[in-house]
Regions:
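A composition/biophysics-driven feature that prefers long, compositionally simple stretches
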Residues: 1-194
Protein backbone atom coordinates (compact mmCIF):
# COMPACT_ATOMS: atom_id res chain seq x y z
CA UNK A 1 0.00 0.00 0.00
CA UNK A 2 1.63 3.23 -1.18
CA UNK A 3 0.26 5.22 1.77
CA UNK A 4 3.01 3.79 3.98
CA UNK A 5 5.66 5.08 1.58
CA UNK A 6 4.00 8.51 1.55
CA UNK A 7 3.85 8.64 5.35
CA UNK A 8 7.44 7.41 5.69
CA UNK A 9 8.70 10.09 3.30
CA UNK A 10 6.91 12.76 5.34
CA UNK A 11 8.17 11.49 8.69
CA UNK A 12 11.75 10.95 7.51
CA UNK A 13 12.11 14.31 5.77
CA UNK A 14 15.31 16.02 6.89
CA UNK A 15 16.54 12.97 8.82
CA UNK A 16 19.25 12.01 6.35
CA UNK A 17 17.65 8.59 5.95
CA UNK A 18 16.77 7.55 2.40
CA UNK A 19 13.64 5.44 1.91
CA UNK A 20 14.16 2.33 -0.19
CA UNK A 21 10.74 1.20 -1.45
CA UNK A 22 10.87 -2.59 -1.38
CA UNK A 23 9.43 -4.48 -4.33
CA UNK A 24 9.18 -1.32 -6.43
CA UNK A 25 10.80 -1.19 -9.88
CA UNK A 26 14.30 0.33 -9.87
CA UNK A 27 14.73 -0.28 -6.12
CA UNK A 28 17.59 -2.71 -5.49
CA UNK A 29 17.21 -5.58 -3.04
CA UNK A 30 19.19 -5.32 0.19
CA UNK A 31 21.79 -7.69 -1.23
CA UNK A 32 22.09 -5.72 -4.47
CA UNK A 33 22.37 -2.45 -2.56
CA UNK A 34 25.13 -3.85 -0.32
CA UNK A 35 27.01 -5.16 -3.37
CA UNK A 36 26.79 -1.69 -4.94
CA UNK A 37 27.95 0.18 -1.83
CA UNK A 38 30.64 -2.07 -0.35
CA UNK A 39 33.93 -2.01 -2.26
CA UNK A 40 35.73 -5.13 -3.49
CA UNK A 41 37.42 -6.77 -0.48
CA UNK A 42 35.31 -4.76 1.98
CA UNK A 43 33.46 -5.99 5.03
CA UNK A 44 29.84 -6.03 6.20
CA UNK A 45 28.82 -6.87 9.78
CA UNK A 46 25.42 -7.55 11.33
CA UNK A 47 23.48 -9.76 13.71
CA UNK A 48 22.96 -12.92 11.64
CA UNK A 49 20.17 -14.08 13.95
CA UNK A 50 17.81 -11.67 12.21
CA UNK A 51 18.30 -13.12 8.71
CA UNK A 52 16.73 -16.16 7.14
CA UNK A 53 19.02 -18.90 5.88
CA UNK A 54 18.06 -17.97 2.31
CA UNK A 55 19.09 -14.35 2.86
CA UNK A 56 22.39 -15.47 4.37
CA UNK A 57 23.07 -17.74 1.40
CA UNK A 58 22.26 -14.91 -1.01
CA UNK A 59 24.68 -12.61 0.86
CA UNK A 60 27.38 -15.29 0.68
CA UNK A 61 26.87 -15.75 -3.06
CA UNK A 62 26.55 -12.12 -4.16
CA UNK A 63 28.93 -10.45 -1.71
CA UNK A 64 31.37 -13.35 -1.79
CA UNK A 65 31.76 -12.78 -5.54
CA UNK A 66 33.27 -9.38 -4.64
CA UNK A 67 35.47 -10.89 -1.89
CA UNK A 68 33.45 -9.03 0.73
CA UNK A 69 33.95 -10.41 4.24
CA UNK A 70 30.72 -11.10 6.11
CA UNK A 71 30.65 -10.95 9.93
CA UNK A 72 27.42 -12.57 11.16
CA UNK A 73 27.91 -12.16 14.90
CA UNK A 74 27.95 -8.39 15.40
CA UNK A 75 25.02 -6.75 17.22
CA UNK A 76 26.04 -3.09 17.19
CA UNK A 77 22.71 -1.87 18.56
CA UNK A 78 23.04 -4.07 21.63
CA UNK A 79 26.52 -2.62 22.20
CA UNK A 80 25.33 1.01 22.23
CA UNK A 81 21.72 0.87 23.54
CA UNK A 82 22.51 1.57 27.20
CA UNK A 83 18.98 1.75 28.60
CA UNK A 84 17.55 -1.06 26.48
CA UNK A 85 14.56 -2.60 28.24
CA UNK A 86 15.20 -6.12 29.47
CA UNK A 87 13.14 -9.01 28.19
CA UNK A 88 10.03 -9.98 30.10
CA UNK A 89 10.61 -12.40 32.95
CA UNK A 90 6.94 -13.28 33.31
CA UNK A 91 6.34 -17.02 33.18
CA UNK A 92 4.37 -18.48 30.31
CA UNK A 93 1.16 -20.42 30.85
CA UNK A 94 -0.30 -23.62 29.45
CA UNK A 95 -3.59 -23.64 27.55
CA UNK A 96 -5.82 -26.63 28.23
CA UNK A 97 -7.26 -28.65 25.35
CA UNK A 98 -10.70 -27.15 25.94
CA UNK A 99 -9.26 -23.80 24.81
CA UNK A 100 -6.98 -25.00 22.02
CA UNK A 101 -9.20 -27.73 20.58
CA UNK A 102 -6.30 -30.17 20.25
CA UNK A 103 -3.64 -31.57 22.55
CA UNK A 104 0.11 -31.33 22.01
CA UNK A 105 0.51 -35.04 21.20
CA UNK A 106 -2.04 -34.84 18.39
CA UNK A 107 -0.41 -31.75 16.89
CA UNK A 108 3.05 -33.34 17.04
CA UNK A 109 1.68 -36.45 15.35
CA UNK A 110 0.28 -34.34 12.50
CA UNK A 111 3.56 -32.42 12.11
CA UNK A 112 5.51 -35.68 11.96
CA UNK A 113 3.12 -37.08 9.35
CA UNK A 114 3.79 -34.02 7.17
CA UNK A 115 7.52 -34.36 7.78
CA UNK A 116 7.34 -37.97 6.60
CA UNK A 117 5.50 -36.89 3.43
CA UNK A 118 8.45 -34.62 2.63
CA UNK A 119 11.10 -37.09 3.76
CA UNK A 120 12.21 -34.72 6.52
CA UNK A 121 13.81 -36.06 9.68
CA UNK A 122 14.17 -32.68 11.41
CA UNK A 123 11.86 -29.65 11.38
CA UNK A 124 13.12 -26.37 12.88
CA UNK A 125 10.37 -23.93 13.85
CA UNK A 126 11.43 -20.34 14.53
CA UNK A 127 7.97 -18.77 14.21
CA UNK A 128 6.78 -17.83 17.70
CA UNK A 129 3.09 -18.16 16.89
CA UNK A 130 3.64 -21.61 15.35
CA UNK A 131 5.50 -22.75 18.47
CA UNK A 132 2.78 -21.37 20.76
CA UNK A 133 0.14 -23.22 18.75
CA UNK A 134 2.13 -26.47 18.60
CA UNK A 135 2.99 -26.67 22.31
CA UNK A 136 -0.18 -25.00 23.65
CA UNK A 137 1.47 -22.32 25.74
CA UNK A 138 1.41 -18.55 25.68
CA UNK A 139 3.46 -15.81 27.27
CA UNK A 140 4.26 -12.13 27.55
CA UNK A 141 7.56 -11.65 25.70
CA UNK A 142 6.11 -9.63 22.82
CA UNK A 143 4.12 -6.51 23.63
CA UNK A 144 0.50 -6.99 22.44
CA UNK A 145 1.05 -10.64 21.44
CA UNK A 146 0.74 -13.60 23.84
CA UNK A 147 3.98 -15.22 22.68
CA UNK A 148 7.22 -16.50 24.18
CA UNK A 149 10.70 -16.23 22.66
CA UNK A 150 11.60 -19.79 21.76
CA UNK A 151 12.66 -22.22 19.07
CA UNK A 152 11.42 -25.75 18.51
CA UNK A 153 13.08 -28.65 16.71
CA UNK A 154 10.77 -31.57 15.95
CA UNK A 155 12.33 -34.97 15.28
CA UNK A 156 10.79 -38.39 14.68
CA UNK A 157 10.90 -39.39 18.36
CA UNK A 158 11.58 -36.20 20.28
CA UNK A 159 11.18 -32.46 20.39
CA UNK A 160 13.72 -29.88 21.55
CA UNK A 161 12.41 -26.63 23.02
CA UNK A 162 14.86 -23.73 23.36
CA UNK A 163 13.53 -21.25 25.90
CA UNK A 164 14.45 -19.26 29.00
CA UNK A 165 14.01 -21.96 31.65
CA UNK A 166 12.69 -19.46 34.22
CA UNK A 167 9.55 -18.99 32.10
CA UNK A 168 8.39 -22.57 32.60
CA UNK A 169 6.11 -23.50 35.48
CA UNK A 170 5.50 -27.04 36.77
CA UNK A 171 2.37 -27.49 34.64
CA UNK A 172 4.26 -26.73 31.41
CA UNK A 173 7.21 -28.90 32.44
CA UNK A 174 4.82 -31.78 33.11
CA UNK A 175 3.15 -31.38 29.73
CA UNK A 176 6.47 -31.10 27.91
CA UNK A 177 7.82 -34.24 29.63
CA UNK A 178 4.63 -36.13 28.77
CA UNK A 179 5.22 -35.29 25.09
CA UNK A 180 8.96 -36.09 25.12
CA UNK A 181 9.92 -32.42 24.76
CA UNK A 182 13.49 -31.77 25.91
CA UNK A 183 14.08 -28.29 27.35
CA UNK A 184 17.30 -26.42 26.50
CA UNK A 185 18.59 -22.90 27.22
CA UNK A 186 17.36 -20.45 24.58
CA UNK A 187 20.79 -19.54 23.18
CA UNK A 188 21.85 -23.17 22.71
CA UNK A 189 19.85 -23.19 19.45
CA UNK A 190 22.65 -21.33 17.67
CA UNK A 191 25.12 -24.17 18.16
CA UNK A 192 22.62 -27.03 18.02
CA UNK A 193 21.13 -25.92 14.70
CA UNK A 194 24.51 -25.86 12.92
Amino acid sequence: DGRYFTQALTEMEGSGVRLMKMFVDDTPSTTEWLAQKIPEGGKVAFDGRVLSMGEGQEYEEVLGAKNITIEYEVDLIDQIWEDRPSLSKKPCFFLEDKYTGENVASKLKRVREKMAEYGATVHLIASLDDNAWLLNFRGDDIYFFPLVLDYVIVRKDSVDLYIDDSKLNDRIREEMAKNNVNIHPYNDIYDDAK
